[in-house]
């Protein structure tokens, strides 16, 4: 019999601690206009070629369920960080785009992510970081394959 495998639990726990640590670091940024959970959506938009995406694209990139994504995008819109626009070709499609304020928040997000990465990998060599991330990519691939 194989020994008990705790990878799923450990990854889940890392995710929780990662989010809490991100939020703690974000609180140190007086110009930050977003919370750690919202950074998932903002990061996806910051790295879109044209700075906007459909709800479907954002759901895939962030892993958020549609109902969660909808309420979070609405809050980001109220905060003046994103805009919502209907597609001219297909009225059922709506695009989420960054406002100027949303674009300006990118440098804060990158700074906090860098600081988080420094804490996350404290004591790891470059080789260990590459190896660890390689394992995570394999796990993601395995799970994607099993969900197709």
Where do the protein language model's features map onto the residues?
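Charged, amphipathic alpha-helical coiled-coil/dimerization segments
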Residues: 74-134
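Short, hydrophobic-biased segments on the C-terminal half of alpha helices
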Residues: 55, 73-74
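Alpha-helical linker/hinge and terminal dimerization helices associated
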Residues: 14, 18, 25, 62, ...
């Amino acid at each position: 019999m194989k020994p008990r495998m705790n990878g799923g639990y450990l990854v889940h726990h890392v995710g929780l601690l990662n989010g809490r640590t991100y939020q703690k670091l974000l609180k140190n940024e007086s110009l930050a206009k977003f919370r750690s959970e919202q950074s998932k959506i903002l990061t996806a938009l910051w790295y879109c070629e044209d700075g906007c995406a459909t709800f479907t694209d954002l759901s895939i990139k962030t892993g958020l369920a549609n109902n969660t994504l909808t309420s979070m995008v609405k809050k980001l819109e109220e905060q003046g960080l994103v805009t919502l626009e209907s597609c001219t070709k297909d009225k059922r499609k709506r695009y989420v785009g960054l406002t100027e304020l949303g674009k300006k928040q990118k440098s804060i997000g990158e700074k906090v992510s860098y600081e988080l990465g420094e804490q996350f990998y404290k004591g790891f060599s470059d080789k260990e970081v590459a190896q660890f991330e390689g394992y995570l990519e394999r796990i993601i691939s395995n799970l994607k394959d099993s969900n197709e």
